[in-house]
Structures are given as structure tokens and as C-alpha cells.
Amino acid sequence: MTLKTIEGTFIAPKGKYALVVGRFNSFVVESLVSGAIDALVRHGVSESDITIIRAPGAFEIPLVTQKVAQRGEYAAIIALGAVIRGGTPHFEYVAGECTKGLAQVSMEYGVPVAFGVLTVDSIEQAIERSGTKAGNKGAEAALSALEMVSLLAQLEAK
């Protein structure tokens, strides 16, 4: 018996890509943005097909992402930001609501929303995940977006 497998690829399908970026912790977030753009361009997306939309912070990213998804102009949306744990429960609220909100937008509009919002315990962890020891999570989110666009196109064609 031969099993059929359907998988996405990283070859950029035609389309536009939106980066919704939270400005808080910009010293980390800008590395995520650079990583995402680099990954998209290396996989065939033209810079003219990439739009960066800046939100104040991670908590605001889901609403901005929803408005972008409503427009129907983008093949995928890549959410980028950084929430760093402090001494209050603020971290849990912001990280949780951002995560839930982005998942809701993706399901509601059928548009891939790649999650590149760091939720970390320390500045050191944020730096590691934005281009040093642990790779660049912005680039990883961009690759996830490309793969999802490809996968959904295959599923819709069947």
C-alpha cells in the first residue's frame, strides 16, 4: 500500500506577504524582521511583495492582523514581536491573548498567520532567538508562512 502525503514547500507561491510587527522590545524585534525578510527573499518573494505594518506592541498585533486579513490582499501574514517576562503577571496576559488572537484570525479568515512573537523569560533568551544561538525565529516564521501557503494551495486544488 502506498500512502499519499501532501506537504507544503518553501518555494514562494505568487502573492503578497504582510509582516505585522510589534514595536516594543525593538532591539530584538528588528532582528526578527530582518530574518523574516531575508528568508522570504531567499525563497523567491520580491521585496515589493512584502509590506511591514507596525503595531505598538504584541497585545495589539492580533487586531492589526485581523484588519490586514479582512483586506484579502495577502497570501500570508507573519506576526513578529517580543514579550519578555517581568516581575508581574502582565507577561501571561499579553502572551496568551496575542497567541489566542492570532490563531483566531487565521481560522476566521483562512489566511495563514505565522507566529513569530517571542515569549521568553529573559532578554538573553530573546537575543538568542533573534539571530544568535537558537536561530532567528523571524526567519522560521517566514518559512512557516511559505509552507502554509503552498500546503493550502494544494489542499484547495484537490
Swiss-Prot record:
Biological processes, Gene Ontology terms: riboflavin biosynthetic process
Positions with a binding annotation for (2S)-2-hydroxy-3-oxobutyl phosphate: G87, T88, R129
Keyword set, alphabetical order: Riboflavin biosynthesis, Transferase
Matching SUPFAM superfamilies: Lumazine synthase
GO molecular function annotation: 6,7-dimethyl-8-ribityllumazine synthase activity
Gene3D superfamilies listed in its UniProt record: Lumazine/riboflavin synthase
Protein name (record): 6,7-dimethyl-8-ribityllumazine synthase
